[in-house]
């Protein structure tokens, strides 16, 4: 892929403002737990590259590298609502780490949380988002929606709507959307592009239904891509080699 800035600038306008959904595990090393700054550095570098191109970028990060909330095996000892609240706190930890890693690379970044923490996290306020993004500041959304029983996918779709994103980029470890599980079926077919209607009719796995429906209703395309590929985030904006676009038509 060319690094020529003039070539990049010709491709970027259709994705001037994006919402990137990251899993918590993307910040950890191979063990999948905790935060490993070396493992996360390629993500930081690519975010910096995109901001240098003039892309306005907001992030939603999960907390699965610390605690998977409702998926945690607590039996009947901890209520699901409490577990989800613990998961929201995990996303706050990841968001603070991302903010500082970005700032260390000269990228202006700020964390907004569904639940504020005095002296630490600002409460998410939709009317501020446009001003902050227009300044070139990367926004990192933490704390989910502030409610239990809601996935990080839904948080991502909600924030994408609030910021008026041109697209929601969902970073995964699979290079797009398949007609069946590629980890189980060697003949699984990958789609370069698929419509929202086809996802429903073919029962394809893109993201949770609430998030998917919200993106469809607000005409926000979804790009599912493999973050583990070299320079995959920058490619998602420029060339889209490592994933699948979900569009209205």
UniProtKB/Swiss-Prot annotation:
Q: Under which EC number(s) is this enzyme classified?
A: 2.7.4.22
Top-rank lineage group of the source organism: Bacteria
- Disulfide bridge map: none
GO terms for CC? cytoplasm
What UniProt keywords apply to this chain's record, in alphabetical order?
A: ATP-binding, Cytoplasm, Kinase, Nucleotide-binding, Pyrimidine biosynthesis, Transferase
Principal localization reads: cytoplasm
Where, if anywhere, are coiled coils annotated? none
UniProt pathway = Pyrimidine metabolism; CTP biosynthesis via de novo pathway; UDP from UMP (UMPK route): step 1/1
Residues binding ATP are 21-24, 64, 68, 172, 178, 181
The GO annotation for biological process reads: 'de novo' CTP biosynthetic process; UDP biosynthetic process
Q: Give the catalysed reaction(s), semicolon-separated.
A: UMP + ATP = UDP + ADP
Where is the chain membrane-spanning?
A: none
Record's family? Belongs to the UMP kinase family.
Protein name as annotated = Uridylate kinase
Taxonomic lineage of the native organism: Bacteria, Pseudomonadati, Pseudomonadota, Gammaproteobacteria, Thiotrichales
